[in-house]
Amino acid sequence: YPADHYDGVFIPNWAMWFVLELGEYAERTSDRELVARARERVYALLSYFRRFENEFGLLEKLESWVFLEWSKSNDLVQDVSFPSNMLYAKMKLVMSELYGDAALAEEAQRMQAVIRDLSYTADGFFCDNAYRRDGRLVLSGEYTESCQYYAFHTGTATPALYPELWQRLVHDFGRDRRETKKWENVHYANAFIGNYLRM
């Protein structure tokens, strides 16, 4: 999604954007017919992802090309990608609204709570990923600007929940951070898709 692939490589987490876009389309147009026609396909997508859910309800070891954005983020996608899981939780929330599925809303809220608990660190940022080590998830200790944007864009984080991080992103991050050299422990975002999420 959205294009044909001839070598069998695909981007599993990118299909989640289709569900978010369907939700935005329904909100703008009130086209319930299209939403109803998409139901089978949307739930098939959810069924595909179910097999990757771990004991925390988070996606782990997604197959093929896990794409987040053209930056360091793409090196930090295994074993548990927190931005992908933020997007997955948002996908479930949108599905719950589109199809009146209260169970999915509860799942999404649990996922967001788990992500906040596991990924947000004492450094004041969301860590991008965790590796499975001896049966436990261990944070990589890597932070990217785009991961922070995914957190707020998907509602996993809000300005009310993380006011310091929000202020930091608003005032210290953005186009001139390479010049100001603020927060050099956080890898820079790129135009696609991190800077779009910032907007």
Label each region the model flagged.
Residues Y1-M199:
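Active-site core of glycosidic bond-cleaving carbohydrate-active enzymes
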